[in-house]
């Protein structure tokens, strides 16, 4: 894969996607959107944990990826900027870091 990437880079500039958080904000997700069914009774507010949307709203996350691809992005990044135990601890979700990261990768691949 790396060799193919270098080959393409020799002939043209590749475009990366843009800010994921900015796109998420445009959707106006509510606390209920972030929680989904799975985290409905979670004891901490989850709004703002954008990485969790790969689990609770994968269709919307995929749609954001598709919009970037339609706009001309050659490379998209996963929605997992804060999908690590330290950042997710703010939401009591540190034990879900691996699952959220895997979900984010799966959603990006599906786009």
Q: For each predicted feature, which ranges?
A:
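Domain-level signal for soluble alpha/beta catalytic cores
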Residues: 1-111
């Amino acid at each position: 894969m790396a060799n193919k990437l270098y080959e393409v880079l020799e002939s043209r500039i590749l475009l990366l996607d843009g800010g994921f958080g900015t796109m998420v904000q445009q959707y106006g997700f509510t606390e209920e959107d972030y929680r989904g069914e799975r985290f409905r009774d979670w004891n901490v507010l989850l709004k703002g944990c954008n990485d969790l949307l790969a689990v609770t709203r994968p269709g919307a996350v995929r749609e954001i990826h598709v919009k970037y691809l339609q706009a001309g992005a050659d490379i998209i990044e996963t929605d997992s900027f804060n999908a690590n135990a330290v950042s997710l601890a703010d939401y009591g979700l540190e034990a879900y870091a691996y699952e959220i990261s895997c979900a984010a990768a799966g959603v990006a691949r599906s786009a």
